């Protein structure tokens, strides 16, 4: 999968894209990262990429010209079509469902906004989607783009062992279960005995119940969309879940 990232600060991506899983995936040619400095596409002698807001106001706005030229060049560099996604607090909230969808694509173009924003004429002409990491504001889109590259890239086939992706948080509407490793007792706290029993079915059941409990305690809103069996719903109610308050449209399994 190819990622094209349009940014005013390409150096910010050096660490995240050259370490750990993303580095190995790039070396294995499973992922490609192409950084494009928007300033290189400014045509005036001062390489201006921003200007004051029309109509007045604070800050600066990114000019449409350099962004448009950069986008046109990037899109023409590869025959595969690609969504052009703007990082903006005004966009829909990025989540695991979107990450899974995008991981099936051959290519993704990410546009990093900065300053007060981007000229709306560029957005209307070139941007096909707009996403946010949540209800807060960053100084620019670079950190959001890094997060999206990591979240999407790790889901691309062969980047990770498929087993590593099973039962992750948000994978099926539930949070992940707690993890433990050696030693069996640390600082006076023991690993749950069931995990040392060797009984795989009981371990799987314990982990599933932990996922239910953790989701109820930390993100009860997620239960609205989770696929819950009758036994799951019974357990949750025993733990204080009020099903009606979480919505009436939960998907159910027998």
UniProtKB/Swiss-Prot annotation:
Q: Does the keyword Heme apply?
A: no
Output the Gene Ontology terms for molecular function: tRNA (guanine(37)-N1)-methyltransferase activity
Q: Name one GO cellular component term.
A: cytosol
BP terms from Gene Ontology: tRNA N1-guanine methylation
> Signal peptide span per the entry?
none
Where this protein primarily resides, as one coarse class? cytoplasm
Q: Where does it live in the cell?
A: Cytoplasm
Keywords recorded for this protein, A-Z: Cytoplasm, Methyltransferase, S-adenosyl-L-methionine, Transferase, tRNA processing
Q: What is its EC number?
A: 2.1.1.228
From the UniProt record, list the reaction(s) this protein catalyses. guanosine(37) in tRNA + S-adenosyl-L-methionine = N(1)-methylguanosine(37) in tRNA + S-adenosyl-L-homocysteine + H(+)
Please verify whether the record's keywords include Nucleotide-binding: no
What InterPro entries does the database record attribute to this sequence? Answer: Alpha/beta_knot_MTases, tRNA_m1G_MeTrfase_C_sf, tRNA_m1G_MeTrfase_TrmD, tRNA_m1G_MTases_N, tRNA_MeTrfase_TRMD/TRM10
**Binding positions for S-adenosyl-L-methionine?**
113, 133-138
Q: Which family does the UniProt entry place this protein in?
A: Belongs to the RNA methyltransferase TrmD family.
Described purpose of this protein according to its UniProt entry: Specifically methylates guanosine-37 in various tRNAs.
Subunit and interaction comment: Homodimer.
HAMAP family for this protein: TrmD (MF_00605)
Its name, as the record gives it, is tRNA (guanine-N(1)-)-methyltransferase
- High-level lineage: Bacteria, Bacillati, Chloroflexota, Chloroflexia, Herpetosiphonales
Record gene name: trmD
């Amino acid at each position: 999968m190819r990622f094209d990232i349009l940014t005013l600060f390409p150096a910010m991506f050096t660490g995240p894209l050259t370490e750990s899983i993303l580095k190995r995936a790039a070396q294995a040619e499973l992922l490609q990262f192409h950084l494009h400095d928007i300033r290189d596409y400014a045509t005036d002698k001062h390489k201006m990429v921003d200007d004051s807001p029309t109509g007045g106001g604070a800050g600066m706005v990114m000019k449409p010209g350099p962004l448009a030229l950069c986008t046109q060049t990037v899109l023409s560099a590869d025959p595969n079509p690609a969504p052009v996604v703007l990082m903006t607090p005004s966009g829909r909230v990025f989540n695991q469902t979107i990450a899974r969808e995008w991981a099936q694509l051959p290519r993704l173009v990410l546009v990093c906004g900065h300053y007060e924003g981007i000229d709306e004429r560029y957005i209307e002409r070139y941007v096909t989607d707009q996403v946010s990491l949540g209800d807060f504001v960053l100084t620019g889109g670079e950190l959001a783009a890094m997060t999206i590259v990591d979240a999407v890239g790790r889901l691309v086939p062969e980047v990770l062992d498929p087993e590593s992706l099973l039962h992750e948080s948000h994978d099926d509407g539930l949070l992940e279960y707690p993890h433990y490793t050696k030693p069996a007792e640390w600082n006076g706290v023991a690993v749950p005995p069931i995990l040392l029993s060797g009984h795989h079915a009981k371990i799987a059941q314990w982990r599933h119940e932990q996922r239910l409990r953790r989701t109820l305690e930390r993100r009860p809103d997620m239960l609205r969309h989770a696929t819950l069996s009758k036994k799951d719903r019974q357990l949750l109610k025993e733990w204080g879940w009020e099903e009606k308050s979480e919505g009436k449209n939960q998907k159910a399994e027998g």
